Amino acid sequence: KNETIILINRKLSLIKMSKVVLVMSHLSCADDSKSKLNKKQLLKFKKIKSHFPESLHSLSNSAGILLGKNYHFDMVRPGISLYGGHCKKNEKKIYHQVVSLKAKLIQVRNINKGDTIGYGATYKAKMNMKIGTLGFGYADGFNRLFSNNFQIKLKDKKIDIVGRVSMDLVTIDLTKIKISNSIMKQEFEIIGNKYSINVISKMINTIPYEILTNLGKRYERRYIS
């Protein structure tokens, strides 16, 4: 704001007596490269920057980095892009997939034609089916909007979610999957190469940030370098 620049000018002598290590600001509309506010903020930041020639200067987050070198200054602050998340509207795929989410079965059972699955009986079996239950749910950040509306991967096979996503459980259709003794130990992929945080966020009209930050504390986290 202009008031900030005026205040800095008034306090300039006091500021010069102090050692300011870093001057930092944040772009409000960096995710929209066509927004006029980006250039407006850039110009104001440069005015403030001129009063701190010996300090480091930082303006850009992930989206700001993609606006070009004029926005970079001494350091940038990538956030969502470190996790492979898109940070701009209509952004092309330029990052590698980083985050994956996997779960294991806790139960497999047979149901008969006409049986219903889950709260609200939103899915009715059209045939005799084999149903698997995975140990995660909306309490772990998996949105209820994916009820009857998502596919989970087991290696190269796509498996439908059937029934409503509940607090702690998700049910899937294993009818066409060959069941072996090892299936209870196998990992089913929820977030990964097929459904990245970018794809998932578009499916429920939100942003990758929300998908990522909603992942609950009950998941075991593995950091692989």
Predicted regions and their residues:
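Active-site loop/helix belt of alpha/beta enzymes
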Residues: K1-K104, V108-N112
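C-terminal accessory subdomain/extension
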Residues: N110-S225
